[in-house]
Amino acid sequence: GIWGTLAKIGIKAVPRVISMLKKKKQ
């Protein structure tokens, strides 16, 4: 359903967000 797709997108987006935050901190 909708929540399943959102969960998949969220899981894929998390690593990108973390990498962006790490780059900003550096």
From Swiss-Prot:
Main location: secreted
Keyword Membrane listed: yes
InterPro entries for the chain: Antimicrobial_4
GO molecular function, one term: toxin activity
Keywords on record: Antibiotic, Antimicrobial, Cytolysis, Fungicide, Hemolysis, Membrane, Secreted, Target cell membrane, Target membrane, Toxin
Location relative to the cell: Secreted; Target cell membrane
Tissues where this protein is expressed: Expressed by the venom gland.
Record-level GO cellular component terms: extracellular region; membrane; other organism cell membrane
Pfam family membership, one: Antimicrobial_4
The UniProt record lists the keyword Membrane: yes
GO biological process: defense response to bacterium; defense response to fungus; killing of cells of another organism
Function: Has a broad spectrum of activity against both Gram-positive and Gram-negative bacteria and S.cerevisiae. Has insecticidal and hemolytic activities. May act by disrupting the integrity of the bacterial cell membrane.
Family of this protein: Belongs to the non-disulfide-bridged peptide (NDBP) superfamily. Medium-length antimicrobial peptide (group 3) family. Ponericin-W subfamily.
Protein name: M-poneritoxin-Ng1c
